[in-house]
Swiss-Prot record:
Its EC number is 1.17.7.3. The lineage of its organism: Bacteria, Bacillati, Bacillota, Bacilli, Bacillales. The keyword Iron applies. This is 4-hydroxy-3-methylbut-2-en-1-yl diphosphate synthase (flavodoxin). Its cofactor is [4Fe-4S] cluster. Converts 2C-methyl-D-erythritol 2,4-cyclodiphosphate (ME-2,4cPP) into 1-hydroxy-2-methyl-2-(E)-butenyl 4-diphosphate. Coiled coil: none annotated. Keywords: 4Fe-4S, Iron, Iron-sulfur, Isoprene biosynthesis, Metal-binding, Oxidoreductase. It catalyses: (2E)-4-hydroxy-3-methylbut-2-enyl diphosphate + oxidized [flavodoxin] + H2O + 2 H(+) = 2-C-methyl-D-erythritol 2,4-cyclic diphosphate + reduced [flavodoxin]. One of its GO terms (molecular function) is 4-hydroxy-3-methylbut-2-en-1-yl diphosphate synthase activity (ferredoxin). The gene is ispG.
């Protein structure tokens, strides 16, 4: 297994990507970047959902000039997505951007790449090399005949060398493809070829439903091998949904220490409460919690508490009443009409306890 802790740590704003087992969740805005008010509003929504790094498109000078104003109003690192015009990268860096995403191959002649690298080095800003199966260099396509994992790695190594030759090493690399099997193979080979942090993603994955399934299949396979330091779920949907899916995916692998988990049973003929709507309501309620609380919503009062004994708190419904339980032990019976509200109160108490405990641990570590 490849271990994330063996990758080179790279600072992005106040975060470190690589060098540890934490995976950073990213997303990208859908607004016109020059519309500062709309862009900041969307980023605030992403922050609330749990996004840790956000990328904005910088297609023109208006967008580049907006970077400084956006930076002042947000709390997470900001990444500039640059194509073709190196001057936009320079303007974004001047505006206080935290990371630049470029493809050195389409920035132009060496002196242009050198100008971007020197500006980034001066400000301590990392560069993400974005390799994409759909836009590989002509000579690589001619060599391999079509996009291959080997071709993608060769492209990455070529671009890495351009930066390394300029004595620049604050590099993050992505190896994106819309073909799941190609992406898996490319990331596996990249993890063996260099120790720079890897940004995971399945590009052009599709709509909310199809894209979620496709991304989970591809990124799940990659994550299971211990590969990846940051990720974005790319969906043709509200970017907040990207963050929600990313958090759920990381939770599935035990890689999200700051997210709540819902356990709910499949419906069957024994259920006598509106389990589906209750589960959805509770899921929405815990979606923004930044603690690793496990909450269970079960429809059977006979087996429920025992089946979800790993849950910190939960309810098991029956006709007219429900059982409130903690760690598999029944705490009390509650009337059905206030069952969900009582559960929410218990969730708030446990979440506050967990947050206080984490703060205490943090203070101890800093002493």
């Amino acid at each position: 297994m490849t271990h994330r802790t063996k990758t080179r740590p790279v600072k992005v704003g106040n975060l470190t990507i690589g060098g540890n087992n934490e995976l950073i969740i990213q997303s990208m805005t859908t607004t016109k970047t020059h519309d500062v008010e709309a862009t900041v509003a969307e980023i605030k929504r992403l922050e609330e959902a749990g996004c840790q790094v956000v990328r904005v498109a910088v297609p023109d000078e208006r967008a580049a000039n907006a970077i400084a104003d956006i930076k002042k109003q947000i709390n997470i690192p900001l990444v500039a997505d640059i194509h073709f015009d190196y001057r936009l990268a320079l303007k974004a860096i001047e505006g206080g951007i935290d990371k630049v995403r470029i493809n050195p191959g389409n920035i132009g002649r060496r002196h242009k790449v050198e100008a971007v690298v020197n500006a980034a080095k001066e400000r301590g800003i990392p560069i993400r090399i974005g390799v994409n199966a759909g836009s590989l260099e002509r000579h690589i396509l001619e060599k391999y005949g079509y996009p291959t994992a080997d071709g993608m790695v060769e492209s990455a190594l070529h671009h890495i060398k351009i930066l390394e030759d300029l004595d620049f090493h604050d590099i993050i690399v992505s190896m994106k493809a819309s073909d799941v099997n190609l992406a898996i193979e490319a990331y596996e080979k990249a993890a063996r070829a260099f120790d720079y942090p890897l940004h995971l993603g399945i590009t052009e994955s599709g709509t909310l439903f199809a894209g979620t399934v496709k991304s989970a299949a591809g990124l799940g396979a990659i994550l299971s091998k211990g590969i990846g330091n940051t990720l974005r779920i790319s969906l043709s949907a509200d970017p907040v949904e990207e963050v929600k899916v990313a958090r759920e995916l990381l939770k599935s692998f035990g890689l999200a220490s700051n997210a709540a988990t819902l356990i709910s049973c499949p419906t069957c003929g024994r259920i006598e409460i509106d389990l589906i709507s209750i589960a959805n309501e509770v899921e929405e309620y815990i979606s923004t919690l930044q603690v690793p609380i496990k909450v269970a919503v079960l429809g059977c009062a006979v087996n429920g508490p025992g089946e979800a004994r790993e849950a910190d708190i939960g309810i098991a419904g029956a006709r007219g009443e429900g059982l409130l339980f903690r760690k598999g032990q029944v705490v009390r019976k509650v009337p059905e009409e206030i069952m969900v509200e009582e559960l929410k109160k218990e969730i708030d108490v446990i979440a506050a306890e967990m947050a206080a405990e984490r703060e205490k641990e943090k203070e101890t570590q800093e002493q």
